[in-house]
Amino acid sequence: MITESAINDILANPFDREWTIQGFGMLRTYLDDEQVQRLHIWDTSEAVEDVSTIHDHPWDFTSLILRGAIRNQRFALHEMGESDTGKPFTSAQIRCGVGGGLLSDPRPVRICSLGVEAYGPGDTYSMLAPELHESFPSRGAVTVIKRSF
């Protein structure tokens, strides 16, 4: 994982890097040529209005919280008719970032809360690609993820 000194250099000189912003208010920049490690700066005031923040990923990852705090809510997803429990929700596959958009037709599902986890500076957590979750960062939280393909 990248050193804290290197992260501090990036934060002190942010215009030396290419950044993109996710619809839920997370700035990101890749830290290596292979795009395995990524730095995130969270600011939900930059989120797109009415954006859904419940999502999964196309890869597994481990996240290290450097500054601020993250609450992570995991969910179980059930196809309609499998279960009467949970909250009705609409699911669709999307591509995030520049040039992103819908990749599949939306479908009705149900989601059930699996509990909330809380993390602070120095903490790590891991997610498998298909795990549905929602992140609640403190404003200005800084994290580094390491992706596994």
Residue ranges and their predicted role:
Residues 76-131:
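Short acidic-glycine-tyrosine-enriched beta hairpin
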Residues 1-41:
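A short, N-terminal "cap"/entry segment at the start of jelly-roll beta-barrel domains
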Residues 39-56, 73-79, 129:
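Conserved short histidine dyad/triad with adjacent acidic residue
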Residues 134-138:
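Exposed beta-sheet edge/beta-hairpin loop segments within beta-rich domains
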Residues 34, 49-51, 65, 70:
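Fe(II)/2-oxoglutarate oxygenase catalytic core
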Residues 139-149:
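A short hydrophobic beta-strand segment most commonly corresponding to one strand
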Residues 28, 39-41, 116-118, 124-126, ...:
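Conserved hydrophobic/aromatic beta-strand scaffold that supports enzyme active sites
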Residues 58-72, 76:
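Short, conserved beta-strand element in jelly-roll/cupin
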